[in-house]
């Protein structure tokens, strides 16, 4: 799937895959994220993710351990997508936070704003 073709959602999916591989190919196995790759991805491509926690190193370690379901100290694409799913859900909830219409359907400030 080319980045310039397809629907907005298809392009978004392609972007997520491409960003994952941008980091997974740096060291070790080309299809998993090690701790350094995961940390770099979160710090560079999810800069607002740990904004409140001030990029707490222990929190990053704990998140990776929680996602690493097979305990191989690597995150597969599937394991990493568990984080993306949780972030998307949290962002969706934040969009509706303090909105008098709730989920009936107006959006406030999104994630990272």
Curated annotation (Swiss-Prot):
It is a peripheral membrane protein. Residues 13-48, 55-90 form the EF-hand domain. GO terms for molecular function: antioxidant activity; calcium ion binding; calcium-dependent protein binding. It comes from the Eukaryota. Ca(2+) 1 binds at residues 24, 29, 32, 37. PROSITE patterns: EF_HAND_2 (PS50222), S100_CABP (PS00303). The modification N-acetylalanine is found at residue 2. SUPFAM superfamilies: EF-hand (SSF47473). Phosphorylated. Phosphorylation inhibits activation of tubulin polymerization. InterPro entries: EF-hand-dom_pair (IPR011992), EF_hand_dom (IPR002048), S100/CaBP7/8-like_CS (IPR001751), S100_Ca-bd_sub (IPR013787). Zn(2+) binds at residues 21, 31, 92, 96. Its main location: secreted. GO terms for cellular component: calprotectin complex; cornified envelope; cytoplasm; cytoskeleton; extracellular space; S100A9 complex. The modification Pros-methylhistidine is found at residue 107. Highly expressed at sites of inflammation. Keywords: Acetylation, Antimicrobial, Antioxidant, Apoptosis, Autophagy, Calcium, Cell membrane, Chemotaxis, Cytoplasm, Cytoskeleton, Immunity, Inflammatory response, Innate immunity, Membrane, Metal-binding, Methylation, Phosphoprotein, Repeat, Secreted, Zinc. GO terms for biological process: actin cytoskeleton organization; antimicrobial humoral immune response mediated by antimicrobial peptide; apoptotic process; astrocyte development; autocrine signaling; autophagy; chronic inflammatory response; endothelial cell migration. It holds the Pfam family S_100. It is found in: Secreted; Cytoplasm; Cytoplasm, Cytoskeleton; Cell membrane. Ca(2+) 2 binds at residues 68, 70, 72, 74, 79. Homodimer. Preferentially exists as a heterodimer or heterotetramer with S100A8 known as calprotectin (S100A8/A9). S100A9 interacts with ATP2A2. S100A9 interacts with AGER, and with the heterodimeric complex formed by TLR4 and LY96 in the presence of calcium and/or zinc ions. S100A9 binds quinoline-3-carboxamides in the presence of calcium and/or zinc ions. S100A9 interacts with amyloid-beta protein 40. Calprotectin (S100A8/9) interacts with CEACAM3 and tubulin filaments in a calcium-dependent manner. PANTHER family: PROTEIN S100-A9, S100 CALCIUM-BINDING PROTEIN. S100A9 is a calcium- and zinc-binding protein which plays a prominent role in the regulation of inflammatory processes and immune response. It can induce neutrophil chemotaxis, adhesion, can increase the bactericidal activity of neutrophils by promoting phagocytosis via activation of SYK, PI3K/AKT, and ERK1/2 and can induce degranulation of neutrophils by a MAPK-dependent mechanism. Predominantly found as calprotectin (S100A8/A9) which has a wide plethora of intra- and extracellular functions. This is Protein S100-A9. It comes from Rattus norvegicus.
């Amino acid at each position: 799937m080319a980045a310039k073709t397809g629907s907005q959602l298809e392009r978004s999916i392609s972007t997520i895959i491409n960003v994952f591989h941008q980091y997974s190919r740096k060291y070790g196995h080309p299809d998993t994220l090690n701790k350094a790759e995961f940390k770099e991805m979160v710090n560079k491509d999810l800069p607002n993710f740990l904004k409140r926690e001030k990029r707490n190193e222990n929190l990053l370690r704990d998140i990776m351990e929680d996602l690493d379901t097979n305990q191989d100290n690597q995150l597969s694409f599937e394991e990493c997508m568990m984080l993306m799913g949780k972030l998307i859900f949290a962002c969706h909830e934040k969009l509706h936070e303090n909105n008098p219409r709730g989920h009936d359907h107006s959006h406030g400030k999104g994630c990272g704003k």
